[in-house]
């Protein structure tokens, strides 16, 4: 790709900002639409809990294999082509998640689902970095907030359609139609370039400062994964809540995170990235400390709310930092930190379970709080 073509491809404005928001919404919508279908897949294929857990690992494997390659793909083909291709694959694959009826075919469908999600995740964040940089103001939190809103619409919408009596295939096809409409709406103003020319290898191992930012992303995604997988267990086993109510912990966390991100651009533009990164990571750590140190279910729920609100704008700031560093091309850096961060979601909950088995769940959560303090300690260096 010539420099001239490359420069012409990357001139984002208001319309590109709207298309970026649509891309984040589509990704959240597609990912969350699968969640209400999991029980149907389990019953259709005849899986027990253990075999279902192994099968679901295929999503993570697909994402981890695809994410490191996406930075180079966007450099060669542009954000637009990669986002549209991944979105199209997602639309084709979602109905297969309802139709596959053997473990082998379901594993393949889930691998493709994970790969498509991983590719669109990295590509839309590369586009977001370029668009934010061109705007001259903080926008990343708002983009990530639209992903959360898309998740709420995806999970809630499919659940509502199933509750109304539609079969799973009809419910997911309705979601796919909405995704196609939104992809077509976003199509024209997605970036045809990637901001970075690249004629090198398909994968570049992250180095130096990018590796450190990736570690901080790992910590933040680990904290998010711990809330997703362990907050309900914590509330039932250590705070005496009934299983039917224990989901409140993650629900409060997710709502606080969504609200924080939707208001995050205004907060970051007003306070600056350093104060938001420092305050957010400290808020998350304090939330966990409150949850584990006060023997009250209400205190734990308040603590989880603080974790969600505090963490809401940290990852967007880290993505901005990856886009602004000069150690690696921005597209490769974003692909690297996304991959490392995603490993936190996959490995973190298992590590928490291992620590909890050796000591207690409170100690395991305390370790997460300590890691969050390392993010706070890094705030000045990351945002300078």
Curated annotation (Swiss-Prot):
It is found in: Membrane. It comes from the Bacteria. The chain crosses the membrane at residues 22-42, 52-72, 81-101, 106-126, 143-163, 164-184, 202-222, 240-260, 276-296, 299-319, 327-347, 352-372. Its main location: membrane. InterPro entries: MFS (IPR011701), MFS_dom (IPR020846), MFS_trans_sf (IPR036259), MFS_Transporter (IPR051788). It is a multi-pass membrane protein. Pfam families: MFS_1 (PF07690). Disulfide bonds: none annotated. Belongs to the major facilitator superfamily. This is Uncharacterized MFS-type transporter YPO1221/y2967/YP_0917. It comes from Yersinia pestis. The lineage of its organism: Bacteria, Pseudomonadati, Pseudomonadota, Gammaproteobacteria, Enterobacterales.
């Amino acid at each position: 790709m010539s420099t001239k073509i490359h420069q012409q491809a990357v001139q984002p404005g208001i319309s590109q900002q709207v298309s970026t928001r649509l891309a984040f919404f589509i990704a959240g919508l597609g990912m969350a639409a699968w969640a209400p279908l999991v029980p149907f897949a389990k019953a259709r294929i005849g899986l027990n809990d253990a075999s279902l857990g192994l099968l679901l690992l295929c999503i993570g494997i697909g994402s981890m294999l695809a994410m490191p390659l996406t930075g180079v793909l966007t450099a060669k083909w542009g954000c637009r082509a990669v986002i549209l291709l991944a979105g199209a694959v997602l639309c084709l694959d979602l109905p297969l998640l309802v139709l596959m009826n053997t473990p082998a075919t379901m594993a393949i469908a889930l691998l493709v689902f994970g790969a498509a999600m991983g590719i669109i995740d990295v590509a839309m964040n590369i586009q977001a970095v370029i668009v934010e940089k061109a705007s001259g103001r903080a926008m990343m939190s708002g983009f990530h907030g639209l992903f959360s809103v898309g998740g709420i619409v995806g999970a809630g919408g499919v659940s509502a359609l199933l509750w109304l009596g539609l079969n799973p295939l009809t419910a997911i096809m309705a979601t796919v139609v909405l995704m196609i409409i939104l992809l077509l709406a976003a199509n024209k103003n997605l970036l045809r370039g990637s901001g970075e020319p690249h004629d090198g290898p398909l994968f570049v191992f992250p180095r130096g400062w990018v590796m450190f930012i990736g570690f901080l992303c790992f910590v933040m995604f680990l904290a998010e994964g711990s809330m997703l997988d362990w907050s309900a267990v914590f509330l039932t086993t250590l705070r005496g809540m009934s299983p039917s109510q224990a989901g409140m912990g993650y629900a409060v966390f997710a709502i606080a995170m969504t609200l924080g991100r939707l208001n995050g651009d205004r907060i970051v533009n007003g306070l600056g990235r350093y104060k938001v990164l420092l305050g957010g990571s400290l808020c998350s750590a304090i939330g966990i400390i409150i949850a584990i140190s006060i023997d009250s279910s209400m205190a734990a729920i308040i603590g989880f709310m603080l974790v969600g609100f505090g963490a809401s704008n940290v990852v967007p700031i880290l993505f901005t930092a990856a886009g602004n560093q000069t150690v690696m091309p921005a597209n490769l850096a974003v692909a690297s930190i996304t991959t490392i961060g995603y490993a936190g979601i996959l490995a973190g909950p298992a590590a928490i379970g291992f620590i909890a088995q050796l000591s207690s769940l409170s100690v395991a959560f305390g370790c997460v709080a300590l890691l969050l303090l390392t993010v706070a300690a890094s705030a000045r260096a990351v945002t300078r």
